[in-house]
Amino acid sequence: MTETIAIDVQILPHGEGLPLPAYQTAHAAGMDLLAAVAADAPLVLGPGSHAMVPTGLSLALPDGYEAQVRPRSGLAARHGVTVLNAPGTVDADYRGEICVLLINHGKEPFTIRRGERIAQMVIAAVARAALSITTTLSATARGSGGFGSTGR
């Protein structure tokens, strides 16, 4: 069973009238985020360009959680549009508007209209690390093999 946590959401003036982020299927990990651009002023992303797209929402995440802003696979596959800093992290102490940094890797301009699903948001538990300086690390079969070292 998946845990459900309560998250307070503030709808900003330019987000009024848009539905809240929602899961599209019973087992979806992410909720779709919608573009809160003006209805009479869609945002056009030219090839190679990027822009911050507002969602009209602010969150109060509980301590120990983050929101990850991830691409929607359909936008990437069909149009080459993706989240530039994927995954974007929204920390539990951030109270500003959730914006999505989109980039158009496609060859055609892409128009973002009000209410369009532009990204997905995954709520995830956060583990905090305590780093400890050492002069040696435990040995592994992989060792220091990096990029491409485990094969194709």
UniProtKB/Swiss-Prot annotation:
Reaction(s) catalysed (UniProt annotation): dUTP + H2O = dUMP + diphosphate + H(+)
Q: Which CDD domains match?
A: trimeric_dUTPase
GO MF annotations, alphabetized: dUTP diphosphatase activity; magnesium ion binding
Q: What is its EC number?
A: 3.6.1.23
Q: Which residues are noted in the entry as substrate-binding?
A: R72, S73, G74, N85, T89, V90, D91
Q: Cofactors per UniProt?
A: Mg(2+)
User: Is the keyword Magnesium in the record?
Assistant: yes
InterPro entries this protein is in? dUTPase, dUTPase-like, dUTPase-like_sf, dUTPase_trimeric
A Pfam family of the record is: dUTPase
Give, as in the UniProt entry, the pathway in which the protein acts: Pyrimidine metabolism; dUMP biosynthesis; dUMP from dCTP (dUTP route): step 2/2
Q: Which domain of life is it from?
A: Bacteria
Q: What are the protein's UniProt keywords?
A: Hydrolase, Magnesium, Metal-binding, Nucleotide metabolism
Q: Name one GO biological process term.
A: dUMP biosynthetic process
> Which family does the UniProt entry place this protein in?
Belongs to the dUTPase family.
**Which HAMAP family does the entry link to?**
dUTPase_bact
Q: What does this protein do?
A: This enzyme is involved in nucleotide metabolism: it produces dUMP, the immediate precursor of thymidine nucleotides and it decreases the intracellular concentration of dUTP so that uracil cannot be incorporated into DNA.
Name of the protein in question: Deoxyuridine 5'-triphosphate nucleotidohydrolase
Q: From the UniProt record, report the name of the gene that encodes this protein.
A: dut
